[in-house]
Amino acid sequence: MRLLTLEEGTFAVRYARAVIENYLAGKKIVIESYPEVFNEKRGCFCTLHTYPDKELRGCIGIPEPIMPLIEALEEAAISAATKDPRFPPVTLEEMDSIVVEVSILTPPELIKVNHPKEYLEKIKIGRDGLIIEYGFYRGLLLPQVPVEYGWDVEEYLAHLCLKAGLPPDMWLAEGVKIYRFEAQIFEEVEPRGEVIEKKLL
């Protein structure tokens, strides 16, 4: 799976913003042409932060590559702005003081271990996003999260469990599955401003 160019990443962020602003204004965005890579099935997340204080304002996505990226991006953007249960819906006026971030994901792969303690060696902060599954419980953290909070791998796993509604040490239990994925991250420097690729390592 090839990486996106900065030009394609810039398009992704600009498109996510346009989708949100049109949706909040009661309009449907019509796009006639876009880079070919956006026809590929890829997972993605849209994250909104307040500007300039960078407080989280919404983050939702589609982790699995189940639809063309252009569609996944539209769904993730609208959901991040209006359906994140942690926050009230974003208003159109607020978009003047929000920066948009888009993460393009690699397909999740199961981390195989003989003993759960091996996760501590196999997971790399700044590279790996994680998904935990246990029965009906599921939680996901993007690779930028442990970097932003300064967590080590054990803290990362504990917070992953909490995100899924599980006890923090549940990653040590039998029957738990943990998947990893990588993300290419593009973000606005300021609202509607330059888009850069965010490097975690």
From Swiss-Prot:
Domain AMMECR1 residue range list: 7-197
A Pfam family annotated for this UniProt entry: AMMECR1
Superkingdom of the organism of origin: Archaea
NCBIfam families the record matches: AmmeMemoSam_A (TIGR04335), TIGR00296 family protein (TIGR00296)
PANTHER family: AMME SYNDROME CANDIDATE GENE 1 PROTEIN (PTHR13016:SF0), AMMECR1 HOMOLOG (PTHR13016)
Entry protein name: Protein MJ0810
